[in-house]
Amino acid sequence: MIKLLNQLTHVRLAAPDVEASVRFYEEQIGMRVTDRTDDAVYLRNWGDYYRYSLVITHGDEPALEVMAWRAQSAEALEEAAHRVEATGIAGSWRESSLGHGRSYTFTGPFGHTMELFWEVERFHGEGEDASSYPDRPSRRSRDGVAPRSLDHVTIAASDVRAFAAWYSETLGFRIMAHTTLEHGGISVFTVLTTNEKSHDLGVVLDGSSRAGRANHFAYWVDAREDLLRAADILMENGTPMEYGPSIHGIGEQNFLYFRDPSTFRVEVNTGGYRNYVPDWEAYEWHRAQGSNNFYRNGQMPMSMTESFPPADGPSATEEGILPGTENELINPFAKHGQG
């Protein structure tokens, strides 16, 4: 397995009301604005090692515009670009951007835009931002949920297996697990990673006709108690829980989901395990094994099938592909005990 990418560094979101979203991420999430330009606001968590991990720009509808990844080295960046171009996809180079150096941007076969770079500005808090612990980029946030860092992003694609295969074969993502329907062999969810985490890229099945959609992105907190506290803080400030708190079977991470003011879905998670097996082969999970709900005693809300930007069909569907499974594919985890 070729090792080209190191980690997810930031996501760029479009929001109809930029300032409402910025206030939410500052006050309820506990992020800090680092920069403002004419067309974007940049924010970071206290434990993010780089200048920012969230960029918010104006858009008519909520959307994931870009997901950015740091390469393993300067040579790996060149190799990644070469391998993308070899598949017939034409990307573009940019000499520098705010907070990082030369980057390669491309739109993948399912419509999702990625930016790859190597050179990056490390964040070192000064004054009241400085931590008393030398390894921390800044002191722990006193505000809101206060996640340590950005964790992962989950997109929606019309063919989960094909998406995973392309990113694995082209860019070296490790495929960690699949959720497959018990009959028909249709994959409704797959997780991939660039490192030892259970995943930093997830894929749900998309039955809409709109390419490049995303389901959510996630923040990391240190402990389960922090996650439960996050639910308390959010609900006390008028942000309801969409799903959770609970635990996913795949990855064994504690989770909760909610929406930001643009309606884009956000997850907070913690726990789970690291996988260091270099020749790992992904297992096929079935829903009854608790792939989505570790406890096998709940059901996923139908709203969780919505991806962004909105389209003519929910994200966990491929209606009509196999007669008799339409409802399963619209929400694979709707049955009690599977969600």
Give the predicted meaning of each segment.
Residues 1, 7-16, 59-146, 190-191, 238-339, ...:
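Vicinal oxygen chelate
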Residues 2, 6-27, 33-36, 40-41, ...:
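Catalytic cores of nucleotide-enabled group-transfer and carboxylate-activating enzymes in metabolic
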Residues 3, 9-50, 155-198:
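Core segments of cupin and vicinal oxygen chelate
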Residues 21, 25-26, 84, 111, ...:
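Conserved active-site tyrosine of GNAT-family acetyltransferases
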Residues 32, 52-54, 90-93, 177, ...:
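A short linear hydrophobic-aromatic micro-motif
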Residues 48-54, 111-115, 198-201, 263-264:
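Short, charged/polar, Gly/Pro-enriched secondary-structure boundary elements
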Residues 96-98, 107, 117-211, 248-249:
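Amide-forming acyltransferase catalytic core, primarily the GNAT-like/NAT-type
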